[in-house]
């Protein structure tokens, strides 16, 4: 069955990766080496994911002990 309005990839990253680990957009942006504004636009569905950003997102984020503990 086809989805009529599939979610933006950034929304999926936000909901399935950042939120469950308690990682803020600011923390994730710093770990990825991008501005908070850039990452926020992607996660909120206002910007696409460039090939360079896809490579950055493919790398594991360095987590603090608090984040690893959940």
Swiss-Prot record:
Identify one Pfam family in the record.
HTH_3
Q: What keywords does the record list, in alphabetical order?
A: DNA-binding, Transcription, Transcription regulation
Cross-referenced InterPro entries: Cro/C1-type_HTH (IPR001387), Lambda_DNA-bd_dom_sf (IPR010982), Toxin_antidote_HigA (IPR013430)
- UniProt GO MF annotations: DNA binding
Record-annotated HTH cro/C1-type domain positions? 13-68
Q: Which Gene3D superfamilies match?
A: lambda repressor-like DNA-binding domains
Domain of life assignment: Bacteria
What NCBIfam families has UniProt attached to this entry?
antidote_HigA
The molecule here is called: Uncharacterized HTH-type transcriptional regulator Synpcc7942_2319
